[in-house]
Amino acid sequence: MKKIKVLFVIIFILLFASWSKPREVNITDMEIREGITYVKGETKAFTGIIKSYYENGNLESEGNFKDGKLNGLSKVYYENGNLKSEGNYKDDKLNGLSKVYYENGNLKREDNYKDDKREGLFKGYYENGDLKSEDNYKDG
């Protein structure tokens, strides 16, 4: 009886671990049909993480998808591995804080978005990190 309980717990843990890890797919295995992203040859809209890579093998981009649309954090990288940009998406639209970086890693700009339109504070920076400009946006 004790062995059955232990076996049940192990099976439960393995199932839970497989559910909690998002599916990761290379962008070369993807296709877009009618604005929805799918793994080639599959009929269900993709949920998970799509990644693309530079020819040198370094990560170029990674984006979270839910039901075939960008949802959550998306990042793009320079070929040297430094972060180029990051932003949050909801149903394929930028929402929340978006950041763009210079290749040296310093912040280039910060924008806030609502439904893919600038909304709120914008800050632009020189490559040395000094503030260049600041503005407020309403409805894009």
Where do the model's predicted regions map?
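Bacterial N-terminal signal peptides that target proteins for export
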Residues: 1-8
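Acidic, gly/ser/pro-rich intrinsically disordered tails
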Residues: 10-12
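Glycine/tyrosine- and acidic-biased, solvent-exposed loop/turn segments at the edges of beta-strands
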Residues: 14-140
